[in-house]
Amino acid sequence: MGPSQLDRQSESTTPMTDLSTFLTDTARLTTESFEWGTLTWLCNGKLSPGAGQTVGLCHIHPGQGNPVHYHLNCEEVLHMLSGTGQHGFDGESVELRAGMTIRIPLGVKHNLTNTGDETIVCLIAFNSGERETVFLS
């Protein structure tokens, strides 16, 4: 690492006086349960005030799918950690399996349906700390 890179690293724009606002203890998180699966938020503006992103873990039970929805203020990146499913994407459909990632642009209607025998686990991330979602059903 060159000297200019070290200088830039030491010039933080965010004062780091209280690191607790930057940390999340997953043992203390609340999981939202639905008929189709669960959502656990790891980082967002509510958990970490000032966060410019939202990150969560989504579990979808076999044979189930989350409702068709879209996001008003952000795009989404979904990375499959395990399982297989069909991802509805603005009227089209694509098969997703562990190791695959899909980017969903702002305003695109989408949902994920588990077509396999094991629970889907996926990491979801949004480029806003205050994700806005509109459900169509």
Where are the language model's segments positioned?
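A short, N-terminal "cap"/entry segment at the start of jelly-roll beta-barrel domains
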Residues: 2-52, 67, 134-137
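Conserved short histidine dyad/triad with adjacent acidic residue
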Residues: 41, 56-71
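Histidine-centered metal-chelating micro-motifs
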Residues: 65-67, 86, 102, 106-112
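A generic "binding-loop/recognition-motif" signal
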Residues: 64, 73-74, 92, 108-109, ...
